[in-house]
Amino acid sequence: LMLDLNRQGPHALVAGTTGSGKSVLLQSWCLALASMNGPEHLNFVFLDFKGGSAFRKLERLPHTVGSVCDLDLAHAVRALRALEAELTRREQLSAAVHASDIRDMVNPPPRLIVVIDEFHALKDQLPDYVNRLVRIASLGRSLGMYLIACTQNPMGQVSADMKANMSVSICLRVRDRLQSCELLGDGRAADLSPAMPGAAF
Protein backbone atom coordinates (compact mmCIF):
# COMPACT_ATOMS: atom_id res chain seq x y z
CA LEU A 1 0.00 0.00 0.00
CA MET A 2 1.38 3.38 -1.06
CA LEU A 3 -0.25 6.45 0.45
CA ASP A 4 0.92 10.05 0.05
CA LEU A 5 -0.88 12.32 2.53
CA ASN A 6 0.29 15.42 0.71
CA ARG A 7 -1.13 14.35 -2.66
CA GLN A 8 -4.02 12.10 -1.63
CA GLY A 9 -4.90 13.71 1.70
CA PRO A 10 -4.18 15.97 3.40
CA HIS A 11 -6.16 14.35 6.20
CA ALA A 12 -7.33 10.81 6.90
CA LEU A 13 -10.15 9.10 8.76
CA VAL A 14 -9.54 5.54 9.96
CA ALA A 15 -12.26 3.30 11.41
CA GLY A 16 -12.09 -0.17 12.91
CA THR A 17 -13.61 -2.06 15.79
CA THR A 18 -11.65 -3.67 18.64
CA GLY A 19 -9.32 -6.35 17.28
CA SER A 20 -9.49 -5.11 13.70
CA GLY A 21 -5.81 -4.10 13.65
CA LYS A 22 -6.34 -0.34 13.81
CA SER A 23 -3.61 0.39 16.37
CA VAL A 24 -1.05 -1.74 14.51
CA LEU A 25 -1.98 0.02 11.27
CA LEU A 26 -1.37 3.41 12.89
CA GLN A 27 1.94 2.33 14.38
CA SER A 28 3.14 0.85 11.09
CA TRP A 29 2.06 3.91 9.15
CA CYS A 30 3.89 6.29 11.48
CA LEU A 31 7.03 4.13 11.54
CA ALA A 32 7.06 4.02 7.74
CA LEU A 33 6.78 7.81 7.56
CA ALA A 34 9.54 8.21 10.16
CA SER A 35 11.84 5.83 8.28
CA MET A 36 11.52 7.91 5.11
CA ASN A 37 11.70 11.38 6.66
CA GLY A 38 14.10 12.76 9.26
CA PRO A 39 12.80 14.65 12.31
CA GLU A 40 13.97 17.91 10.76
CA HIS A 41 11.34 17.34 8.03
CA LEU A 42 8.54 15.49 9.85
CA ASN A 43 7.13 15.62 13.39
CA PHE A 44 4.32 13.78 15.17
CA VAL A 45 1.87 14.74 17.90
CA PHE A 46 -0.09 11.81 19.36
CA LEU A 47 -3.43 12.21 21.12
CA ASP A 48 -4.44 8.86 22.62
CA PHE A 49 -7.93 8.72 24.07
CA LYS A 50 -7.93 5.08 25.06
CA GLY A 51 -5.63 5.11 28.04
CA GLY A 52 -2.24 5.91 26.55
CA SER A 53 -1.22 2.50 25.24
CA ALA A 54 -1.60 2.99 21.48
CA PHE A 55 1.47 5.16 20.85
CA ARG A 56 3.77 4.23 23.71
CA LYS A 57 6.38 2.69 21.39
CA LEU A 58 6.26 5.71 19.07
CA GLU A 59 6.93 8.20 21.86
CA ARG A 60 10.64 7.34 21.66
CA LEU A 61 10.93 8.43 18.04
CA PRO A 62 12.99 11.62 17.60
CA HIS A 63 10.12 12.83 15.40
CA THR A 64 7.66 12.87 18.32
CA VAL A 65 7.20 16.37 19.73
CA GLY A 66 4.13 15.63 21.84
CA SER A 67 2.14 12.71 23.23
CA VAL A 68 -0.87 13.01 25.53
CA CYS A 69 -3.69 10.74 26.65
CA ASP A 70 -7.11 10.99 28.23
CA LEU A 71 -5.73 10.10 31.67
CA ASP A 72 -4.66 13.75 31.92
CA LEU A 73 -7.34 15.90 30.29
CA ALA A 74 -5.68 19.14 31.38
CA HIS A 75 -2.57 18.09 29.45
CA ALA A 76 -4.74 17.19 26.44
CA VAL A 77 -6.36 20.63 26.53
CA ARG A 78 -2.94 22.30 26.58
CA ALA A 79 -1.89 20.19 23.61
CA LEU A 80 -4.95 21.20 21.58
CA ARG A 81 -4.34 24.86 22.39
CA ALA A 82 -0.70 24.46 21.39
CA LEU A 83 -1.72 22.94 18.05
CA GLU A 84 -3.95 25.93 17.35
CA ALA A 85 -1.09 28.27 18.27
CA GLU A 86 1.23 26.36 15.93
CA LEU A 87 -1.27 26.75 13.09
CA THR A 88 -1.33 30.52 13.70
CA ARG A 89 2.48 30.65 13.87
CA ARG A 90 2.75 28.91 10.51
CA GLU A 91 0.20 31.29 9.01
CA GLN A 92 2.35 34.20 10.17
CA LEU A 93 5.55 32.62 8.82
CA SER A 94 3.93 32.09 5.43
CA ALA A 95 2.51 35.61 5.34
CA ALA A 96 5.89 37.12 6.23
CA VAL A 97 7.49 35.66 3.09
CA HIS A 98 4.34 35.89 0.92
CA ALA A 99 4.19 32.10 0.51
CA SER A 100 0.89 30.42 -0.31
CA ASP A 101 2.30 27.02 0.70
CA ILE A 102 5.12 26.11 3.09
CA ARG A 103 6.75 24.22 0.21
CA ASP A 104 7.47 27.66 -1.27
CA MET A 105 9.49 28.69 1.80
CA VAL A 106 13.30 28.51 1.86
CA ASN A 107 13.40 27.03 5.37
CA PRO A 108 9.93 25.59 6.00
CA PRO A 109 8.97 24.18 9.40
CA PRO A 110 8.72 20.37 9.60
CA ARG A 111 5.50 18.76 8.44
CA LEU A 112 3.40 18.03 11.53
CA ILE A 113 1.12 14.99 11.63
CA VAL A 114 -1.45 14.94 14.43
CA VAL A 115 -2.61 11.37 15.11
CA ILE A 116 -5.76 10.96 17.21
CA ASP A 117 -6.78 7.53 18.44
CA GLU A 118 -10.42 7.18 19.55
CA PHE A 119 -11.56 10.49 18.10
CA HIS A 120 -15.08 9.84 19.39
CA ALA A 121 -13.74 9.84 22.98
CA LEU A 122 -12.00 13.18 22.43
CA LYS A 123 -15.26 14.57 21.04
CA ASP A 124 -17.22 13.28 24.05
CA GLN A 125 -14.76 14.45 26.70
CA LEU A 126 -13.61 17.75 25.17
CA PRO A 127 -16.41 18.83 22.80
CA ASP A 128 -15.49 22.51 22.98
CA TYR A 129 -12.05 21.79 21.54
CA VAL A 130 -13.09 19.83 18.46
CA ASN A 131 -13.53 23.07 16.49
CA ARG A 132 -9.81 23.70 16.91
CA LEU A 133 -9.20 20.53 14.92
CA VAL A 134 -11.74 21.63 12.30
CA ARG A 135 -9.58 24.71 11.70
CA ILE A 136 -6.52 22.53 11.20
CA ALA A 137 -8.50 20.37 8.78
CA SER A 138 -9.52 23.47 6.81
CA LEU A 139 -6.16 25.26 6.69
CA GLY A 140 -3.57 22.61 7.45
CA ARG A 141 -2.61 21.44 3.99
CA SER A 142 -0.82 24.59 2.85
CA LEU A 143 0.72 25.00 6.31
CA GLY A 144 2.10 21.46 6.55
CA MET A 145 -0.23 20.20 9.29
CA TYR A 146 -2.07 16.92 8.79
CA LEU A 147 -4.69 14.99 10.77
CA ILE A 148 -5.15 11.24 11.07
CA ALA A 149 -8.33 10.70 13.09
CA CYS A 150 -9.19 7.17 14.20
CA THR A 151 -12.35 5.79 15.73
CA GLN A 152 -14.09 2.51 16.51
CA ASN A 153 -17.43 3.89 15.38
CA PRO A 154 -17.46 6.39 12.48
CA MET A 155 -21.19 7.15 12.75
CA GLY A 156 -21.62 10.92 13.01
CA GLN A 157 -18.25 11.46 14.69
CA VAL A 158 -16.79 13.92 12.20
CA SER A 159 -18.55 17.17 11.29
CA ALA A 160 -19.39 17.93 7.67
CA ASP A 161 -16.77 20.71 7.59
CA MET A 162 -14.07 18.38 8.85
CA LYS A 163 -15.11 15.44 6.69
CA ALA A 164 -15.00 17.63 3.57
CA ASN A 165 -11.23 17.94 4.05
CA MET A 166 -10.58 14.27 4.86
CA SER A 167 -9.85 12.81 1.44
CA VAL A 168 -8.41 9.54 2.73
CA SER A 169 -10.73 6.99 4.35
CA ILE A 170 -9.47 3.64 5.62
CA CYS A 171 -12.06 1.22 6.95
CA LEU A 172 -10.97 -1.93 8.76
CA ARG A 173 -13.55 -4.40 10.11
CA VAL A 174 -16.46 -2.57 11.73
CA ARG A 175 -19.39 -3.84 13.77
CA ASP A 176 -22.17 -3.45 11.22
CA ARG A 177 -23.00 -2.42 7.68
CA LEU A 178 -24.24 1.03 8.71
CA GLN A 179 -20.80 1.90 10.07
CA SER A 180 -19.19 0.62 6.89
CA CYS A 181 -21.61 2.67 4.76
CA GLU A 182 -20.73 5.80 6.72
CA LEU A 183 -17.14 5.60 5.48
CA LEU A 184 -17.26 3.59 2.27
CA GLY A 185 -20.78 4.04 0.95
CA ASP A 186 -21.41 0.29 1.18
CA GLY A 187 -21.36 -2.48 3.79
CA ARG A 188 -18.33 -4.53 2.75
CA ALA A 189 -16.11 -3.64 5.74
CA ALA A 190 -18.62 -5.31 8.07
CA ASP A 191 -17.99 -8.58 6.24
CA LEU A 192 -14.22 -8.65 6.85
CA SER A 193 -13.17 -11.73 8.79
CA PRO A 194 -12.04 -11.34 12.43
CA ALA A 195 -9.33 -13.85 11.50
CA MET A 196 -7.74 -11.22 9.23
CA PRO A 197 -6.78 -8.26 11.44
CA GLY A 198 -5.36 -5.46 9.35
CA ALA A 199 -7.55 -6.14 6.33
CA ALA A 200 -9.16 -2.91 5.18
CA PHE A 201 -10.76 -1.00 2.35
Question: Predicted segment positions?
Answer:
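Conserved AAA+ ATPase small/helical "lid" subdomain
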Residues: D191-F201
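P-loop NTPase catalytic phosphate-binding loop
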Residues: L1-S193
